[in-house]
């Protein structure tokens, strides 16, 4: 009889084991299927967002490129370059002219253009030529605008605005340095008191300021790139500092000056980048913050519900790994809301109600980070859980109170997250929060009494047998306590906000700029060993490239061409741990960026400049080119570097206007091949 009973018991255990195994396999299969569906849904959303953004940027680049492949647009914006008089090509508008002009020369062969005015009109002069809204010299800088836009644009408005600020500030310092050098040597290298050593020392010092201060990436890139370009022209005795002749209403600023062109083209590129994130569909970080907050609340709800259900189970099963996966996903969502909060400052500048909205969500984010810390304790408890007889006693006593506390806590959390949206806690909302907090306190008391009662049955409150149960109970209670404290602070938000100064250092944009400037140029950091190594590692290649540009002539080298040092300024590694693969990707991006557009343009050149087919083909090529490689930039983390480099360095060839003369076209192609070399 005993043997039969033992056999039956063994069969029951085997059957139970097989049943558990089957159940676990079924749960794993169901979990995998659910995960696959969720993953596909997220991938589909990301694909649509990335594709839409790529198409929008491509559309902006195509519209911006109209003056390049449309002669009418080029004349409207930059004026009439030349005209045919008696089968002879005569130059009309010079590179430094803009606006409507009259010809006070002898005839059409001897053109002398001046600005139109009432006196000339009264004398019988008629408008002769339109020289554009911008001087013709800006036409050569048109690809620079596209390159700036490509290095500036990001997935959201706030991040793009931040990049734009970095770009403009870096370029501004480069322009400021050239004005300083022009003050010392008004004619540049052709000045009587000019000495090359001073110019080299200035260049090295400016590079040191950018690199040793460890400024933001875009600040360093655009600042150093603009510096080497401006300084090369300054040190060229044939050109010197091109201050310009077409004066503006701003003192010391000429519309056709090189410093003005560099500054304005960078600003235009930044404006295009920002506009791409606003129209046709706004991609504001501040609007994502509330969605992220609700997503986090939903994730916390699922995690704590699953944790309590698993805790109240009768045996270990694979559900705990599913819970751990959700915890990891929640951490990613919390990082996202932190990034959106930081970037949203550059959209709102804490003006109006946005200061309060950001303050409320910053407090929410802090509370959620405290919750994230609690999750580590819960994970540890679930891993150690034994499901023995002591555990079953805890489940019977604590299961109900835990679930009730979870429900009340999530109800309070959801209310508070929604109350943050409008940046104001009304008296009615304050009263609701206080009622929710009181309910949480009541449920905490019930749970504490239940735990005290069941733990008292053991000889010790802390023992190996009940340690996981104690830890789990503590974590649930601590989670509720953290959110309770945050909710109480939220209820008193309005009174605290009124006591806060309206223009304190945290919300004043000028104070923030001053603080950043001070931190950048802190001497102890700039002259630290790490900063000096970083400076030498990046400045030496740029200075070597600059020396080649200064002195090398012949073969593939063009003296005083900024291609080599400017490219190095945009490509050097700003991360100390940059890998060989990353540098190889940059090299591939630059190479393909120069060669692929050449192949495209070689086909377009078969059509004459006034051909409608050429107009459509050139515009379509720009659109497809930027749609494809911008999509690579957004969609692929591995190949993003190549995508952005191809887009940024391809503009010089794609945005080349049509040349009716074979000699000019051939010279342009030769120049592009030298750039590749």
What is the predicted role of each segment?
Residues 296-512:
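Cytosolic, long alpha-helical scaffolding segments
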Residues 2-356, 488-677:
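A transmembrane helix-and-boundary motif of multi-pass membrane transporters/channels
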């Amino acid at each position: 009889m005993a043997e039969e009973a033992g056999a039956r018991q063994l069969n029951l255990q085997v059957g139970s084991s097989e049943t558990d195994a089957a159940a676990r396999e079924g749960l794993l299969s169901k979990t995998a299927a659910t995960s696959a569906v969720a993953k596909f849904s997220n991938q589909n959303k990301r694909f649509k967002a990335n594709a839409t953004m790529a198409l929008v940027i491509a559309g902006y680049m195509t519209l911006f490129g109209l003056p390049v492949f449309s002669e009418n647009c080029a004349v409207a914006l930059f004026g009439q370059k030349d005209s045919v008089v008696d089968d002879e090509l005569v130059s009309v508008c010079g590179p430094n002219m803009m606006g409507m002009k009259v010809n006070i020369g002898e005839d059409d062969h001897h053109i002398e253009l001046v600005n139109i005015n009432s006196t000339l009109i009264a004398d019988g002069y008629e408008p002769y030529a339109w020289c554009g809204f911008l001087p013709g010299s800006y036409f050569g800088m048109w690809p620079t605008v596209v390159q700036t836009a490509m290095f500036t644009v990001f997935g959201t408005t706030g991040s793009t605005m931040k990049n734009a600020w970095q770009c403009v500030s870096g370029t501004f310092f480069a322009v400021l340095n050239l004005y300083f050098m022009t003050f010392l040597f008004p004619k540049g290298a052709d000045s009587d008191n000019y000495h090359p050593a001073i110019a080299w020392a200035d260049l090295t010092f400016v590079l040191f300021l950018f690199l040793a201060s460890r400024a933001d990436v875009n600040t360093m890139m655009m600042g150093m790139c603009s510096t080497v370009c401006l300084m090369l022209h300054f040190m060229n005795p044939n050109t010197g500092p091109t201050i310009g002749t077409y004066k503006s209403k701003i003192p010391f600023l000429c519309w056709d000056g090189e410093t003005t062109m560099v500054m304005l083209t960078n600003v235009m590129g930044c404006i295009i980048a920002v506009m791409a994130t606003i129209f046709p569909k706004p991609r504001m970080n501040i609007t994502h913050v509330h969605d992220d907050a609700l997503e986090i609340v939903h994730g916390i709800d699922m995690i704590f519900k699953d944790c309590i259900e698993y805790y109240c189970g009768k045996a270990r099963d694979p559900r705990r790994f599913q819970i751990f996966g959700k915890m990891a996903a929640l951490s990613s969502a919390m990082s996202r809301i932190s990034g959106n909060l930081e970037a949203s400052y550059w959209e709102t500048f804490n003006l109006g109600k946005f200061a309060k909205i950001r303050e409320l969500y910053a407090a929410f984010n802090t509370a959620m980070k405290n919750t994230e810390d609690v999750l580590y304790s819960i994970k540890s408890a679930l891993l150690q859980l034994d499901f023995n007889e002591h555990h079953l006693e805890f489940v019977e006593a604590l299961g109900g109170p835990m679930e009730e506390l979870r429900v009340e806590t999530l109800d309070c959390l959801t209310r508070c997250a929604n109350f943050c949206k409008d940046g104001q806690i009304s008296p009615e909302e304050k009263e609701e929060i206080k009622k929710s907090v009181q309910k949480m306190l009541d449920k905490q008391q019930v749970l504490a009494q239940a735990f005290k009662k069941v733990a008292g049955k053991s000889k010790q409150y802390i023992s190996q047998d009940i340690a996981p149960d104690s830890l789990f109970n503590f974590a649930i209670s601590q989670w509720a306590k953290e959110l309770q404290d945050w909710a109480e602070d939220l209820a008193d938000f309005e009174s605290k906000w009124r006591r806060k100064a309206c223009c304190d250092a945290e919300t004043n944009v000028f104070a923030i700029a001053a603080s950043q400037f001070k931190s950048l140029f802190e001497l102890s950091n700039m002259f630290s060993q790490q900063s000096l190594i970083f400076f030498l590692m990046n400045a030496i290649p740029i200075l070597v490239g600059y020396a080649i540009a200064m002195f090398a002539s012949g073969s593939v080298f063009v003296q005083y061409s900024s291609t080599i040092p400017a490219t190095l300024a945009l490509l050097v590694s700003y991360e100390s741990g940059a890998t060989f693969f990353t540098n190889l990707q940059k090299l591939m991006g630059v190479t393909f960026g120069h060669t692929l557009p050449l192949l495209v343009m070689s086909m377009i050149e078969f059509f004459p400049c006034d051909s409608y087919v050429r107009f459509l083909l050139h515009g379509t090529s720009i659109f497809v080119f930027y749609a494809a490689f911008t999509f690579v930039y957004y969609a692929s983390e591995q190949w993003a570097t190549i995508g952005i480099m191809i887009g940024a360095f391809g503009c010089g060839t794609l945005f080349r206007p049509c040349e009716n003369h074979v000699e000019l076209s051939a010279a342009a192609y030769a120049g592009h091949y030298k750039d590749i070399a």
